[in-house]
Amino acid sequence: MSSRQDKEKSVNVQVLLRCRPFSDDEVRSNAPQVITCNDYQREVAVTQTIAGKQIDRVFTFDKVFGPTAKQRDLYDQAIIPIVNEVLEGFNCTIFAYGQTGTGKTYTMEGECRRAKSGPKGQLPADAGVIPRAVKQIFDTLESQNTEYSVKVTFLELYNEEITDLLAPEEISKAALEERQKKPLPLMEDGKGGVLVRGLEEEIVTNASEIFSLLERGSAKRRTAETLLNKQSSRSHSLFSITIHIKEATPEGEELIKCGKLNLVDLAGSENISRSGAREGRAREAGEINKSLLTLGRVITALVEHLGHVPYRDSKLTRLLRDSLGGRTKTCIIATVSPSVHCLEETLSTLDYAHRAKSIKNRPEVNQKMMKSTLIKDLYGEIDRLKAEVYAAREKVGVYIPKDRYQQEENERKAMADQIEQMTTSLEANQKQINDLQEKYDSELQHSADLSKKLEATEKCLDHTSNLLSTTKEDLKQAQYNLKEKDYIISEQRKAENALIQQACLLRSDLEKSNRENAALYSKIARGDKLNAANRSVVNSFQADLASKLDILSTTLATSIDQQNKHLKSVENLCKSCVDSHDTATSEIKKKILASKALYMSHMEAFQNVVLLHKANSNSTLEDISSLSAASCCSLDQLLACVEGEAQKIFGDIQNLLADHRSEVAHFTQELRESFRISLDRTKDMSSFILGLFDKYVEETSKLQSHSNHTHEAQVKSLEDFQKAYEEQSKSEEQKLLADITSLVSKHVTRQRELVGGRLNSLGDAARGNKAFLDEHTSAMEVVTKDAKRKWEMFAEQAENDCKVGSNFSAAKHCRMETILQECACTVDTAAQQWKASHATVNDLCRKQIAEVEALVRSAIETNEQHEAEIASSRATAEEHASNSSKDLLQDVDNMLQEARNSSSRVVSTVEAHLGESQHLQESHSSHTAGINTHADNAFQSSYKDYEPTGETPVRSEPEVPSKDAIESLRAMPMESLMDEFRENHPYEPSKDRRPSLIPRSPLATINN
């Protein structure tokens, strides 16, 4: 309970923000403005650029004063209520916080001197918080016509050392140096606060004295010029005003009401690199920043409610301990600069000021003291001091150090002044008492005169008293009835408010349900849109795939027809080559047989001539028969030898031609077999490609059927879902009219279950569809890769077959050339042998002629005739042999040329077929790659999965009040409420008291 009361009494620290206008240097440099103040909305916006982006940070304070705000505006709106609270007996603190050069001292002090021309000593427009607060205090005290006393202190905190700015100037220089060496100590007062021992308290009686003291102390403050401020405060200052106001109670007792106002001007935090501080100034800036950093840590600890608050880390925080988290009302004036050059310090000031808003103080009114008690305490203090003085003089007491003795002497001096003041006040009070006694005597005389009149009115008073008692009883009864009615009305209002609150909760739950239904409908619409887009992607992919497959099928069919044509042309070429070879061989055979027959006829004719010559020569050459017989035998042997050689040559030629024919037939057979194998492979490849197309068509039909089936299933599912949702909505709407409380939750739950189940089924169907499409797509990719591999193998095999056929043809061509060369060599050998035989015959003839020249002179004519016939026969035979050899060589050359032409035609046909096969392979590869790319684009880029947007509501169970809870909100009947009120507040009739007959004392005049 006590902690709750403390929380109720706690008050947040009031934080004001003031932004100064641009200085002359900033105006000349055209510095950008980063601070925007909104006085009406109490907001401050800071514009900063981070990573090329402009970011605005907005801070909210209790009051905001822009660059155009005047000193009077700030004081009238924010400081006047604080000064009034000081006059009510509170301790209040006002301090300025911010960077150096932002106008803290100007805000707190301003222009301290009063205007000389004003009839009432009005302050100048630039006067700050301190002079305006002083003027308000004295104006208020003087207007109240009360006795008061005002004391002021003014201290400076420089480098963690406290200096009294109101120390008397007549102190000797040695004493002043000694005091400066020994700064004033800071001590605990035992009540959670601190006090400075030896601090001068100046008693002032009017505002002019305070202004003079303020000017004197401000002149002693340490200031210096920096790059940021021409007159920068190098220390913190604390100006305290303590007010004692005497009040009189109705009982005649006098009380002393005490209030204290602390006005703090903090030194500004500064960046040494920008302020240009060096050596001593840098040390000053370091101490200032250290104390302000400790102040920031204290603010952070108070805001975060840490167990330890570092008050003792700095004398500044020790002095402000009661103002931050204590029993004092605190107001912080944060001052900032609008320039971009001070953006970092401005953000730091705004952050600390914004955090300081969360500090909670527990202000308490200072306890009022009775004047007699205060005088008694002062007398006791005087007696104690006298005893100490006596002990010190008689040397029977405790000795203390010299500095403490001086401090106590100063304190005693102050106490003596206070006692003297109190004595003066006591004499004035005694004089006032005497005056009041005289007035009292005169009033007694006057009351004696009035007593006679009082006796006359007492009789009337008795009657009036009786009437008044009756009226009071009636009034009391009426007031009791009014209280009873008020109690009933309040209870009914409570019940009505509870019912309204419950209805609002139900309405918010219903609105939330409607929003969630809208989100679910939007999600279903997104799913339908995504499915439609995917269906269009699949349909377009199916159409493109069918068109590309048709193109590929047409290309392959054309290629197969071209290959069949090429194979037929090659087969025709082979057949024509074989036929030409057969024709040439038969012609050569005929020519050889004709040559042989001609040769045999010539030989027979020659033999006939020889036999005829022999028969004719028998009669004339009987004497040389032996020699002729020998010559004939030699000639017969020679002819037989020549005939054997000729038969042998003709046999060799026939054997060579037979071998050549068999080799040509074998070559033709092998070439046919090679082309047959190539044709079979082409047919296999064609059948494989046709099967591949059949598989593509089958996969496409499967995809089409599955897509149609999936679409139909989804459409049917959505129709079922729509019907079920409409039916359930109608039934739920009818039921909602009966019992709105319980069925709202059931309605929401059923809708969520129904929508969740349908969405799950749709999600499963979409995932199954995607898996099916992925499976068939992968199958199509496998089939395409297999077809590509088969086609590459086929192309490689066809190329190898072409190379083998070409090599085989070249080898057979070389073999035929070799055989023909051998045949030509054989013919040349036969001709040479024939010439050799002819020469041998001529030699034998010449020998025979030489031997038988004497014997055949008689038959010269006959021999010459026979020789001429033989020569003509020989010439004819030689001519026929030469013509036959030439014809045979010409036929062999023609056959060789025809074989070469046929081989070149076959090679060109095979090369053309190979080029078309390679072109077909490249075209098929490009079409296959295009199909794969299109499939990847269709199923990886265009085909999209459902992506959650985060807008689908999370499933949650609504809080449904029970019937008992709703019934408990119903207001009780009026009779029950009246009985309850009468039971808790029973009516007590007033006792019938008779009016007193004792004469009343006369009234004393309180104020004259």
UniProtKB/Swiss-Prot annotation:
PROSITE patterns: KINESIN_MOTOR_1, KINESIN_MOTOR_2. Its main location: cytoplasm. InterPro entries: KIF11-like, KIF11-like_kin_motor_dom, Kinesin_motor_CS, Kinesin_motor_dom, Kinesin_motor_dom_sf, P-loop_NTPase. Residues 910-931, 943-962, 975-1008 are annotated as: Disordered. Responsible for microtubule translocation. May be important for the organization of phragmoplast-specific arrays of microtubules. Plays an essential role in stabilizing the mitotic spindle. Required during mitotic cytokinesis. It holds the Pfam family Kinesin. Residues 402-459 form a coiled coil. One of its GO terms (molecular function) is plus-end-directed microtubule motor activity. One of its GO terms (biological process) is mitotic spindle assembly. Belongs to the TRAFAC class myosin-kinesin ATPase superfamily. Kinesin family. KIN-5/BimC subfamily. This is Kinesin-like protein KIN-5C. The gene is KIN5C. ATP binds at G98, Q99, T100, G101, T102, G103, K104, T105. Residues 12-359 form the Kinesin motor domain. GO terms for cellular component: cytoplasm; mitotic spindle; spindle microtubule. The keyword Secreted does not apply. Keywords: ATP-binding, Coiled coil, Cytoplasm, Cytoskeleton, Microtubule, Motor protein, Nucleotide-binding. It is found in: Cytoplasm, Cytoskeleton; Cytoplasm, Cytoskeleton, Spindle. Residues 913-925, 979-995 have a biased composition (Basic and acidic residues).
